UniProtKB/Swiss-Prot annotation:
The reaction(s) this protein catalyses: N-acetyl-D-muramate + ATP = N-acetyl-alpha-D-muramate 1-phosphate + ADP + H(+); N-acetyl-D-glucosamine + ATP = N-acetyl-alpha-D-glucosamine 1-phosphate + ADP + H(+)
Family listed: Belongs to the kinase AmgK family.
Keyword vocabulary terms for this entry: ATP-binding, Carbohydrate metabolism, Cell shape, Cell wall biogenesis/degradation, Kinase, Nucleotide-binding, Peptidoglycan synthesis, Transferase
Disulfide bridge positions per record: none
GO biological process: cell wall organization; peptidoglycan biosynthetic process; peptidoglycan turnover; regulation of cell shape
A GO term for molecular function: ATP binding
One protein family per Pfam: APH
Classification via InterPro entries: AmgK, Aminoglycoside_PTrfase, Kinase-like_dom_sf
Protein name per UniProt: N-acetylmuramate/N-acetylglucosamine kinase
């Protein structure tokens, strides 16, 4: 509440001659919160509150300028010392909200194709040396969240010697081909919850953790989501659509689609291991229970993919030992 009062006082200095109502709008998985300031004439802005003792708004401001080729929120005012940023208001309707309201496959595909178009535009603008690299150390730190948080906390187990061997074999097999993929700008959380339904182009949110990394990463984030799931044939068609657009745009994807699909699936393994660990950490460390029920979806993704590739047999064996081989119940599937 103290932060909200401080934000309101700051906004009164930014808009000294305008009355406004300040209401809660949204919260992220980290410490950021968003409020909507609605003025007497009905117009509104969105205010980011990022406590400076917990995080800096500097990465957000840097990437916001870098990603100006897509429809990111415009920064109207900012105070980096206080951790406050005023943004133009892109509305309330995320792609996820729109999809849950309109559950037809045709409507979902239309939205996802819009998102893919924006992703290609973002990737076309990529330049080396601008963003931090998505390197081996980062990938390794991320996937180690799986044994550290999912296995240790969610399952309450410690890997046996044999299981540690299976895990190490997985890491040694998985990371080299991912690191060998051509690199582009990676949003890192390009999901339907972070895309806004706006007039014209989709709004793109939550980009502050962007890196320079594997070209298939953001497509995996979009099509193998935490909160909504589509049949594999539907996803396959959209991966093909992306691959065709990427080739036409001159992006560095393989000429053979089956090779690109392998990139996509293996990249998904890294992301799914990471997210399962993060969702467990959000619950056990941070007390946030919103994400924990979606962990089974990532376990299903992981089992399906690791079953398909002989090289990933150690991961499949480990998953079967830890959580069995039955499909786990999840939320929305289309």
């Amino acid at each position: 509440m103290q932060r909200q009062i401080k934000l309101k006082n700051w906004l009164q200095t930014v808009y000294p001659e305008r009355d406004f109502d300040l209401t809660f709008a949204a919260a992220d998985a980290d410490f950021r919160r968003y409020f909507r300031a609605t003025f007497s004439d009905g117009s509104s802005v969105v205010c980011m509150d990022a406590p400076p003792d917990k995080m800096s708004v500097a990465p957000y401001l840097k990437v916001q300028k870098l990603f100006d080729m897509v429809n990111v929120p415009q920064v109207l005012h900012a105070d980096t010392d206080l951790g406050f940023v005023v943004l133009n208001d892109l509305g309330n309707t995320t792609f996820l909200t729109a999809m849950l309201q309109e559950q037809g496959e045709t409507a979902h595909k239309a939205l996802l194709l819009e998102a893919i178009g924006e992703l290609v535009e973002l990737q076309k603008a990529s330049r080396e040396g601008v963003l931090p690299e998505y390197d081996r150390e980062t990938m390794l730190r991320e996937i180690n969240l799986f044994p550290e948080w999912f296995v240790a906390k969610e399952l309450g187990r410690e890997l046996t010697f044999k299981q540690r061997q299976l895990w190490q074999q997985t890491v040694d097999t998985l990371l080299p081909p991912l690191l060998a993929q051509p690199k582009v700008y990676v949003h890192r959380d390009f999901i339907v919850r972070n895309l806004m339904l706006t007039r014209g182009r989709p709004g793109v949110l939550d980009f502050q953790d962007a890196l320079y990394g594997p070209i298939s990463y953001d497509l995996v984030s979009l099509l193998r989501d935490a909160f909504i799931e589509w049949e594999e044939e539907f996803v396959l068609d959209l991966v093909i659509r992306y691959w065709e657009k990427a080739r036409a745009a001159g992006l560095p994807v393989p000429e053979a689609f089956d090779e690109f699909y392998r990139w996509f699936e293996w990249m998904g393994v890294q992301r799914h291991l990471k997210v399962a660990g993060i969702f467990a950490r959000l619950y056990y460390r941070d007390g946030k229970d919103k994400y924990r029920p979606e962990i089974p979806r990532f376990l299903n993704y992981l089992r399906r993919v690791s079953r398909r590739y002989a090289e990933l047999a150690p991961l499949y064996a480990l998953l079967v030992e830890l959580v069995g081989d039955e499909e786990l119940e999840t939320g929305f599937t289309f």
